[in-house]
From Swiss-Prot:
InterPro entries: NA-bd_OB-fold, Primosome_PriB/ssb, Prisomal_replication_PriB. Keywords: DNA replication, DNA-binding, Primosome. Belongs to the PriB family. Involved in the restart of stalled replication forks, which reloads the replicative helicase on sites other than the origin of replication; the PriA-PriB pathway is the major replication restart pathway. During primosome assembly it facilitates complex formation between PriA and DnaT on DNA; stabilizes PriA on DNA. Stimulates the DNA unwinding activity of PriA helicase. This is Replication restart protein PriB. GO terms for molecular function: single-stranded DNA binding. Residues 1-101 form the SSB domain. It comes from Cronobacter sakazakii (strain ATCC BAA-894). One of its GO terms (biological process) is DNA replication, synthesis of primer. PROSITE patterns: SSB (PS50935). Homodimer. Interacts with PriA and DnaT. Component of the replication restart primosome. Primosome assembly occurs via a 'hand-off' mechanism. PriA binds to replication forks, subsequently PriB then DnaT bind; DnaT then displaces ssDNA to generate the helicase loading substrate. HAMAP family: PriB.
Amino acid sequence: MANRLVLSGTVCRAPLRKVSPSGIPHCQFVLEHRSVQEEAGFHRQAWCQMPVIISGHENQAVTHSITVGTQITVQGFISCHKAKNGLSKMVLHAEQIELIDSGD
């Protein structure tokens, strides 16, 4: 079954870094996406805020460059996480993060 998502946007919530009891580092943040997409021949505004998590030692170096306002492209897969309040939320599990050059 295919489960791939590529999403570009701006980090809108400060990264939270944690280490699991088994020693695996995790970095969590929220990515805000805004764009204009074409659907059925019409242009429409597309907007979402997507929680992102990236795990593992090999992926943590790029996360130290990420702050609120950083523009990035994230590639990975989506999965549901159950929150403490019992509600499920969709989360993008990043496998690759690329910083977008703002041109400054």
